[in-house]
A protein has these predicted regions:
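Short alpha-helical elements within RNA-binding folds
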Residues: 59-60, 183
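N-terminal export signals
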Residues: 5-25
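Short, low-complexity, Pro/Ser/Thr/Gly-rich segments in the mature regions of secreted, periplasmic
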Residues: 255, 259-265
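Acidic/histidine-rich, surface-exposed loop or edge segments in extracytoplasmic proteins
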Residues: 36-47
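Hydrophobic, ordered structural segments
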Residues: 45-55, 61-69, 74-155, 171, ...
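Short, glycine- and small/hydrophobic-rich beta-strand elements in well-ordered beta-sheets
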Residues: 19-33, 64-90, 96, 184-213, ...
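Surface-exposed interaction/gating patches
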Residues: 45, 141-221
Length: 266
């Protein structure tokens, strides 16, 4: 073999090996990193408490079954433990990717079973609307908890409560730092003390950006308070809250204490 041909063949072989190694590394990386879900969080701002039964009927008989037929589940539906007047109903919908989120609107609207089951709600007259407005946030799950996790009492449909929190930040960079703080140990600490988080989401669209939203759970109020007390004493939390890189990441905290609707899948 001529030296020129030998070098040519050697370079080609090296390139193939490099490509193979890169592909293998990429494959391993994709196997190690679970795909992060996307979430839509809706807040139905009802006209009055009198319209809540119609919304419940629509969600339980029409909307949730339609989502489930598209493989979108579990869908959570919650009311406030101490509802305001008029009340707000929260709906949490998980999506595999943004395309599923965008397509769901059209697929659901063309679903004959959905249209039939939701006819009363969908045909509500202008003179008697069910809600004032629907607020909606589209969120990306955190890398530290890429999918919804259901505790045993949710799966078994036992009595349970949820606390949902939104952490607003004064800048985009500080909002990302707070997400990193969760991913770098805060989520683990919450699991370890029994706070039983359901989801963590970085808001991509919606009101009051930038912010993140997450939900914890417990079997009752006493257990929930006990878990938060334990979290406050956790060494990992003590380390994180005193780390200068995470200073001033949160400018406003909003909390909701929620109870699941009887038909909620969370």
């Amino acid at each position: 073999m001529k030296r020129r041909d030998f070098l040519k063949n050697s370079l080609a072989a090296s390139a193939l090996v490099s490509l193979s190694c890169a592909a293998t590394a990429q494959e391993h990386a994709s196997q190690k990193a679970p795909v992060q879900e996307y979430y839509e969080l809706r807040a139905y701002r009802l006209k009055s408490a009198a319209t809540e039964p119609m919304l419940d009927e629509f969600l339980s008989k029409a909307a949730l079954p339609a989502f489930n037929r598209l493989g979108i589940k579990p869908v959570g539906v919650f009311g406030e433990i101490q509802p305001k007047d008029p009340p707000t109903v929260f709906v949490l919908i998980p999506y595999a990717n943004p395309a599923q989120y965008a397509g769901a609107v059209h697929h659901v609207a063309a679903d004959p079973d959905y249209l039939k089951a939701g006819a009363a709600y969908l045909g509500t007259p202008k003179s008697n609307p069910v809600y004032d407005r629907i607020d909606s946030w589209f969120m990306l799950a955190f890398a530290g908890m890429p999918k919804i996790v259901l505790p045993a009492y949710s799966k078994e449909r036992k009595p349970r409560l949820f606390e949902m929190r939104t952490y607003e930040s004064y800048s985009e960079s500080k909002a990302l730092k707070k997400v990193a703080m969760f991913n770098n140990g805060e989520i683990d600490a919450m699991h370890e003390v029994g706070l039983a988080p359901i989801f963590y989401g970085q808001a991509l669209t919606g009101p009051n950006l930038p912010h993140l939203t997450y939900m914890t759970s417990a079997e009752n109020e006493e257990a929930h308070k006990k878990h938060w007390d334990a979290f406050g004493k956790h060494p990992k939390w003590d380390q994180l809250k005193n780390d200068p890189q995470y200073a001033d990441t949160v400018s406003k905290i909003t909390k909701w204490f929620l109870t699941p609707k009887p038909y909620s899948q969370i």
